[in-house]
Amino acid sequence: MTELLVGTRKGLFVLEGEPGAGFSIRTRAFVGDPVDYAMRDPRTGRLFAAVTSPFWGPRIWFTDDLGEEWQSARGVALPRGGSDALKRVWVIVAGEDAGRLYAGGDPGVLFESRDDGETWELNRALWEHPTRPRWRRDSGGLSVHSIAPWPGDPQRLALAISAGGVWLTEDGGETWAHGNEGIVAGYLPEEARATAIDLCVHHLERAPRRPERLFLQFHGGVYRSDDAGRTWTDIAAGLPHDFGFPVVLDPADPNSAYVIPVTTTDRVTDGRVAVWETRDAGATWTPQDEGLPLKDAYLSVLRQSFAATGEGPSLQLYFGATSGEIFGSGDAGATWFGVAQRLPAIASVRPA
């Protein structure tokens, strides 16, 4: 049985089913409130939800049982007395040692928990980084939205910030270094590109079987790094558009990546929906669209709304749209089926 945690503008939906056999809504939570992200810690089974209440603001909630009450985590806040306010928590990721999790949000913040998500602490080194005044808010805010731990090494971490570029640490977040070399911000004046820090990275993922390899969807470009994020190569040639938001990998194949290209102007699929796949590290791309809408389909898929579970030929892929539809594949993208319709606008999809 596959569980889908679906964060929407009007609450959390938990779906259950099997590829090709249908999915149904098991339960809902935080009805009426925006749920920006939800995940289940694969180590403990604990569920987490990032909820932005119009009354209480952004919080992280957790529960060990969907049938029990959710508890509010402590410490998800910015220092008192400052001019900034916490606006959103966009992502929660399990770390590489027991009890550790990370959460990223707006305005360009990273939180860390060492007690299975019950309490959190702000990463001061990133918050107080001297380049922060040069970071820039984009249409989605100023957000830490991608967090990529290094398998087996809790000291190494890669982050993506929109719009603040790629950041790397090798000492558990005590210090941070930029990882922007090779990324070309075509939307900036040419004379500003070489020194720009405020790069609009849309999503970043690490290949778990070859952790020095990362894939990145940019604001105009799809990139690959083979040196742990220090330098990047554009691999977008062959795609119908180089603009998009999510990127997903097959854990079994470090040469794999999946993207959903959208138009630059209105940021939706251009009439037909296709997931584009590479199995040669971006040298070539192939559209995978059997079972997807191929006519008059203008979908917007946000960066956290495309995810995978499993690996290899039985890799399951799921993506949701702001129009409330979810599509899935049980065979690594070869064929697709409808999972759900008429949900509220979807912000995140995570299978467990």
Model feature map: region roles:
Residues M1-A352:
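Extracellular glycan-interacting surfaces
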